[in-house]
Structures are given as structure tokens and as C-alpha cells.
Amino acid sequence: MRVIASSIRKGNVIEQDGKLYVVVSAENIHPGKGTPVSQIEMRRISDGVKISERYKTTDQVEKATIEERNFTFLYEDGDGYHFMNPETYDQVQVSKDVVGDAAAYLQPDMTVKLSTHDVNVVSLALPQRVTLEVVETEPVTKGQTASSSYKPAVLSNGIRTTVPPHIAVGTRIVVMTEDGSYSERAKD
């Protein structure tokens, strides 16, 4: 399907020169003089090579037809990550290149969205928030509960983040998967 370049967003899949690219970032630039352009950074799905392209905002770009489905994460082995379709119980293996940094947040039985083109998995979308346990942080300081300062912490998946002073080791917290930031204390 052909669309204008200015409508391309992060996560879209573009077909160019017979190859598929997933959009890493897309920005529309309107200079004071001259024609507005769309600056698009893409990662080639087949081998992970990153490229950057500039299009006039009115140029036509071939947007690939992508099918999104919910899958359940099962396990990881040396070959990649294994997911199951909860409706058909079909299993699919996804390479480490496609999963990328999202691997740190994957937990058994977690539901994720896998985007496929033909039969190939091209991208993975995590839930917005995950619950993790704090495994290392400074001790709780009495009297600092209303402070807006944060202290460093290491989570059960190895990610480093900052948490409020009242959070102690062993506390389960909700973390945003997009940037690894603290959201709230878990309610479970």
C-alpha cells in the first residue's frame, strides 16, 4: 500500500528495493526555506543494518502489509525466543535480532504482540508496563517519604532505574517498558 512519507510512524514496516525495513524513528522537518522533508531511520529486517532516508513529505512510500497477533512468551534457548499463539497453540521462534532490547522485559506467560509479514516475524511489541522486583538499592531513609529525590536501583531483570526513597529491596514495582522508568509500587 502506497502512503505519503509524512504519514510514516515509528514501528511501521516499509518495503524498499524488495527489502523490508522497520521504522526506528520518523521526523517531519519544516525548514524556513525550501521543501518540508521526512527524515526516517530504518532497520533492515533481514540483517539488522540501519539506514537513514530523507523523503519529500509528499513522496510516496510503499508501506508493507503487516498482521499483528497476540502471542504468549514461552522460553528462550540458544536459537532464539519461543512464543505460542493462544488460539491455535502454534509455536513460533523469533530471532534475537528481532527481539532486541525487549528481551530484558520478557517473562514466562507474558502476552506480547508479534507483527508478521507473510510468515516472517518482523517486530515485537511489549505491554506498556511490567511488574519487577527490586534486587539492589540503598536502604530506606526515614523521613524522606515525601521527597521528590530518587535513588538508583537494580531490578530482577538486570535493568538499572531510579526509584523513590521509600522503595526497599524485595519490593515489587511497575516499570514502563519503553524507557525502563519507575511508574508505581505494584498492587499485588
Curated annotation (Swiss-Prot):
InterPro entries: Elong-fact-P_C, NA-bd_OB-fold, Rib_uL2_dom2, Transl_elong_fac_P/YeiP, Transl_elong_KOW-like, Transl_elong_P/YeiP_cen, Transl_elong_P/YeiP_CS, Transl_elongation_fac_P. It is found in: Cytoplasm. It holds the Pfam family Elong-fact-P_C. It comes from the Bacteria. GO terms for biological process: peptide biosynthetic process. The keyword Repeat does not apply. Keywords: Cytoplasm, Elongation factor, Protein biosynthesis. One of its GO terms (cellular component) is cytoplasm. GO terms for molecular function: translation elongation factor activity. Pathway: Protein biosynthesis; polypeptide chain elongation. Gene3D superfamilies: 2.30.30.30, Nucleic acid-binding proteins (2.40.50.140). Belongs to the elongation factor P family. HAMAP family: EF_P. Involved in peptide bond synthesis. Stimulates efficient translation and peptide-bond synthesis on native or reconstituted 70S ribosomes in vitro. Probably functions indirectly by altering the affinity of the ribosome for aminoacyl-tRNA, thus increasing their reactivity as acceptors for peptidyl transferase. This is Elongation factor P.
